[in-house]
C-alpha cells in the first residue's frame, strides 16, 4: 500500500527542517537551517541532569509537572514580568513548546471552528488545528518588516472564530510584536468568545534595547490566553524538550485534560535538573539578548557588502537573507543552490505559507559558534561573488 486512503493530513509531508538538516548531513554542509545551537549547554545543567538520575528520579513525574519546577517558573515570571502566577493552578510543564501548543488547541478548538494565524506561520500550527477538525484562517504579515494587518484581522473575525494563534518574537519572520499590537488584539476580540494561543519561546531573544511584549502583560489578553515558553530556547538545550504553558486556572484545567492523555508527563530527572539549575542561577537568562545580538550583528556586518539585503531582525535567533539582487523569486530553489554550491543549509520561507507569495528570502539560524557563523558567511560571500547580481 503506497498511500493511506484515510489520512487526516494527506497533503503533509516531512517538515522542511528535517529535509534541510538531512541534506546538510548528506552533503557535509554547515547547517544554518534548523534552529538549534552547535555549542554545548552549560556543563552545570548536564551535571544536574546526571545527578538527578543517580538520585533515582527515573519514574513518572507528576502529570502537571514537578512542583519545585513550577515554583521556579512562577519565580521566573515574577522576575521577568512582575507577575504573580499560581504554580499549582496556572503552570503546566510540557514536552517542549510544541506539545503545549498542540494540547491547548485540542483542548479548546473543535469541528467547525476557525483559528486565525499569521503567515509565515510555524509549521506545527496548521496541522494541530486541522487535527482538531477546525479551519485555519491564514493572514499574511506585511513585509518587509512583517507587521500585522489589523484591518484584515477584524475582517476575518466571525461567529466561528475560536482562537487567535499569536507568535512573538516571530519565527520565521524575525519580527516582534509591540505593546500597541497587544492592545489592538485585545480590542479586536473584546466581548467575543475568542481565546489566544501565544507562542513566546523566544521571549528572551529581543534586540536593540526592546522589551518583550508578552500577552501576560496585557490584562485582558492574559485572562483569555495560553502563553507558551521553552527552556530549550532559554537554556540552549533543545534536546531536553521542556516547555511550559501559563494560563488561567480555568484554561489550565482544560489544557491538562488533553496533556494527561497526550504525554502524561515528561522527563522526571530533567525537571529536577532544571529546577535545581534555576535555584542556583535564577537569572541566567538575562544575558541572552546581548549574547544573540552580538551574533546577529556579526552576521549582518559580515554580509553588509555581499549584495544580499538584510531585513530587520528584531527578535528570535534567526536572520533573513533577501536574495532579490541575485535571482528571480523562488526561495526553495535558491536555498538548494546555497546548500549545493555554497555548502550552507538555510530554510526557505514559502513552506510557512498557505499561499506562498513570490519570495526572495531564506532564513539563517545564528545560534551557532562564532567560528561556524564566520565560515558560513565566508561561503555565502564567495557564492555571491561567483554568481553576481542579476542584470549586473
Q: What spans do the regions from the language model cover?
A:
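N-terminal small-domain helix-loop-helix segment of the aminotransferase-like
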Residues: 2-96, 103, 278-280, 386-392
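Structural signature of PLP-dependent enzymes
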Residues: 57, 255-259, 278-301, 328-330
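Conserved PLP-anchoring active-site segment centered on the Schiff-base-forming lysine
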Residues: 107-129
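A short helix-loop-beta submotif of the ANL/AMP-binding
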Residues: 131-137
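Active-site phosphate-binding strand-loop segment of PLP-dependent enzymes
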Residues: 137, 141-210
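Active-site PLP attachment segment
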Residues: 217-254, 266, 360
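Conserved glycine-rich beta-strand-loop-beta hairpin in the small C-terminal domain of fold type I
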Residues: 275, 290-300, 310-323
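PLP-dependent enzyme catalytic core of the Aspartate aminotransferase-like
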Residues: 337-346, 352-392
Amino acid at each position: 500500500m503506497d498511500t493511506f486512503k484515510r489520512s487526516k493530513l494527506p497533503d503533509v509531508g516531512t517538515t522542511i527542517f528535517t529535509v534541510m538538516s538531512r541534506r546538510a548531513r548528506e552533503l557535509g554542509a554547515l547547517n544554518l537551517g534548523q534552529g538549534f545551537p552547535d555549542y554545548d549547554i552549560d556543563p552545570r545543567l548536564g551535571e544536574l541532569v546526571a545527578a538527578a538520575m543517580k538520585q533515582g528520579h527515573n519514574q513518572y513525574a507528576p502529570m502537571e509537572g514537578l512542583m519545585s519546577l513550577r515554583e521556579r517558573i512562577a519565580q521566573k515570571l515574577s522576575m521577568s514580568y512582575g507577575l504573580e502566577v499560581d504554580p499549582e493552578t496556572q503552570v503546566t510543564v510540557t514536552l517542549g513548546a510544541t506539545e503545549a501548543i498542540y494540547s491547548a488547541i485540542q483542548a479548546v478548538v473543535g469541528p467547525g471552528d476557525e483559528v486565525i494565524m499569521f503567515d509565515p506561520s510555524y509549521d506545527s500550527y496548521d496541522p494541530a488545528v486541522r487535527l482538531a477538525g477546525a479551519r485555519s484562517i491564514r493572514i499574511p504579515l506585511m513585509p518587509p518588516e512583517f507587521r500585522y494587518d489589523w484591518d484584515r484581522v477584524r475582517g476575518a473575525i466571525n461567529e466561528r472564530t475560536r482562537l487567535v494563534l499569536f507568535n512573538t518574537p516571530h519565527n520565521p519572520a524575525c519580527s516582534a510584536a509591540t505593546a500597541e499590537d497587544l492592545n489592538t488584539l485585545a480590542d479586536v476580540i473584546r466581548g467575543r468568545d475568542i481565546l489566544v494561543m501565544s507562542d513566546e519561546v523566544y521571549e528572551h531573544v529581543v534586540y536593540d534595547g526592546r522589551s518583550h511584549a508578552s500577552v501576560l502583560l496585557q490584562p485582558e489578553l492574559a485572562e483569555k490566553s495560553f502563553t507558551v515558553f521553552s527552556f530549550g530556547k532559554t537554556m540552549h538545550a533543545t534536546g531536553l524538550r521542556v516547555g511550559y504553558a501559563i494560563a488561567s486556572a480555568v484554561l489550565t484545567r482544560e489544557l491538562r485534560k488533553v496533556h494527561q492523555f497526550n504525554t502524561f508527563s515528561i522527563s522526571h530527572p530533567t525537571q529536577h535538573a532544571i529546577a535545581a539549575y534555576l535555584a542556583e542561577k535564577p537569572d541566567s537568562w538575562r544575558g541572552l539578548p546581548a549574547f544573540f545580538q552580538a551574533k546577529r550583528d556579526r552576521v549582518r556586518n559580515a554580509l553588509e557588502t555581499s549584495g544580499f539585503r538584510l531585513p530587520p531582525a528584531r527578535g528570535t535567533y534567526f536572520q533573513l537573507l533577501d536574495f532579490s539582487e541575485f535571482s528571480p523569486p523562488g526561495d526553495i530553489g535558491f536555498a538548494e543552490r546555497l546548500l549545493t554550491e555554497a555548502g550552507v543549509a538555510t530554510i526557505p520561507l514559502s513552506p510557512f505559507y498557505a499561499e506562498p507569495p513570490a519570495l526572495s528570502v531564506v532564513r539563517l539560524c545564528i545560534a551557532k559558534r562564532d567560528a561556524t557563523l564566520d565560515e558560513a558567511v565566508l561561503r555565502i560571500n564567495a557564492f555571491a561573488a561567483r554568481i553576481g547580481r542579476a542584470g549586473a
